[in-house]
């Protein structure tokens, strides 16, 4: 049976989702990332771990942080980076996803970093590579539909560990549009695997997916109750591009009911940290006083994201 992520030795072959990824693999990625964080402070920000390797970035959806940090991470590992312009590629002329992959593989690709609107697209690519005896080529999921965003989940775990040191006594709240969020799904799976005892999902009923309670998540529709004594707050934007129908009265009403203000932040523990995967919409899910405040670790998340993505690619490349 095709194993989507691990080889027969239990080593990472692709990174497609955090769901089902063993704790040992997650911790290995986080520990490896720790060794890469300081590279950004060096005069020469490079290590030769992927010299001679070709990394193809295939972003079928828009991205700023993920695409840029993957490119920086690849270059800091000394890989050759090819950014495919999807709008100008043959996929805009009707070429199928797998035909695109086959043609790029013929150019001796070593790794594909893929963001796609369709859930499961990275898995499809990984299976195709396995079926066509190209198991030496690795796939990293940079976000697929509403399904998963594993590197964001991993960098969120790195950030939490950096500031809180230990997962075993934490209460983590995820607030906002959880229904459409691949980040929320990846974070919930990672937090569960790492032993976080209490995960809370906070949002209006229309933006909370079914099945959260079965995953061990406590659900709150009252943000004031949900934020009480939490250690970590992960804010999520409204994903209007994925919404169909009127799920909310307005962005202003959402902020009034669920926006993170200084008053609401005060309900959390005094040393609580505030996170956000971006892009951030000020005045919708978070006010500027909180986003720019001392408890926000939103920009460090971006910095840590480079190291985490370096770790993932380095491990996949066999280092």
Swiss-Prot record:
**A GO CC term?**
cytosol
According to UniProt, the reaction catalysed is:
carbamoyl phosphate + L-aspartate = N-carbamoyl-L-aspartate + phosphate + H(+)
Record keywords, A-Z: Pyrimidine biosynthesis, Transferase
InterPro entries xrefs? Asp/Orn_carbamoyltranf_P-bd, Asp/Orn_carbamoylTrfase, Asp/Orn_carbamoylTrfase_sf, Asp_carbamoyltransf, Asp_carbamoyltransf_Asp/Orn-bd
Query: Where does this protein come from, organism-wise?
Result: Janthinobacterium sp. (strain Marseille)
What Enzyme Commission number(s) apply to this enzyme? 2.1.3.2
Pathway involvement of the protein, from the record: Pyrimidine metabolism; UMP biosynthesis via de novo pathway; (S)-dihydroorotate from bicarbonate: step 2/3
| Purpose of the protein | Catalyzes the condensation of carbamoyl phosphate and aspartate to form carbamoyl aspartate and inorganic phosphate, the committed step in the de novo pyrimidine nucleotide biosynthesis pathway.
Q: What is this protein called?
A: Aspartate carbamoyltransferase catalytic subunit
Binding sites annotated in the UniProt record for carbamoyl phosphate: 65-66, 115, 149, 152, 278-279
Entry's Gene Ontology molecular function annotations: amino acid binding; aspartate carbamoyltransferase activity
Which PROSITE patterns does this chain map to? CARBAMOYLTRANSFERASE
> Which Pfam families does this UniProt record tie to the protein?
OTCace, OTCace_N
**Which domain of life does the UniProt lineage start with?**
Bacteria
- Its quaternary structure? Heterododecamer (2C3:3R2) of six catalytic PyrB chains organized as two trimers (C3), and six regulatory PyrI chains organized as three dimers (R2).
Family membership noted in the UniProt record: Belongs to the aspartate/ornithine carbamoyltransferase superfamily. ATCase family.
- Annotated residues that bind L-aspartate are located at 93, 182, 237
- Name any Gene Ontology BP term: 'de novo' pyrimidine nucleobase biosynthetic process
């Amino acid at each position: 049976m095709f194993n989507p992520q691990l080889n027969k030795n239990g080593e990472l072959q692709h990174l497609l989702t955090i769901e089902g990824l063993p704790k040992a693999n997650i911790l290995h990625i986080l520990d490896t990332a720790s060794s890469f964080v300081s590279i950004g402070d060096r005069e020469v920000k490079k290590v030769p771990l992927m010299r001679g390797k070709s990394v193809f970035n295939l972003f079928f959806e828009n991205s700023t942080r993920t695409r840029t940090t993957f490119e920086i991470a690849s270059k800091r590992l000394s890989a050759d980076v090819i950014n495919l312009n999807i709008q100008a590629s043959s996929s805009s002329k009707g070429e199928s996803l797998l035909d695109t992959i086959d043609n790029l593989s013929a150019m001796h690709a070593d790794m594909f970093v893929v963001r796609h609107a369709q859930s499961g697209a990275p898995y499809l690519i990984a299976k195709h590579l396995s079926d066509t005896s190209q198991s030496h080529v690795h796939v990293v999921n940079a976000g697929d539909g509403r399904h998963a965003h594993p590197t964001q989940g991993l960098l969120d775990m790195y950030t939490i560990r950096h500031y809180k040191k230990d997962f075993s006594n934490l209460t983590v709240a995820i607030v906002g549009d959880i229904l459409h969020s691949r980040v929320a799904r990846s974070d919930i799976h990672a937090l569960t695997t790492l032993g976080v005892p209490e995960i809370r999902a906070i949002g209006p009923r229309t933006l909370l997916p079914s099945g959260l309670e079965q995953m061990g998540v406590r659900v709150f529709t009252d943000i004031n109750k949900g934020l009480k004594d939490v250690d970590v707050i992960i804010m999520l934007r409204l994903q209007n591009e994925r919404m169909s129908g009127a799920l909310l009265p307005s962005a202003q009403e959402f902020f009034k009911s669920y926006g993170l203000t200084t008053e609401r932040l005060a309900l959390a523990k005094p040393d609580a940290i505030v996170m956000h995967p971006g892009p951030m919409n000020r005045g919708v899910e978070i006010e500027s006083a909180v986003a720019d405040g001392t408890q926000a670790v939103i920009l460090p998340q971006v910095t840590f994201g480079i190291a985490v993505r370096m770790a993932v690619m380095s491990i996949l490349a066999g280092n």
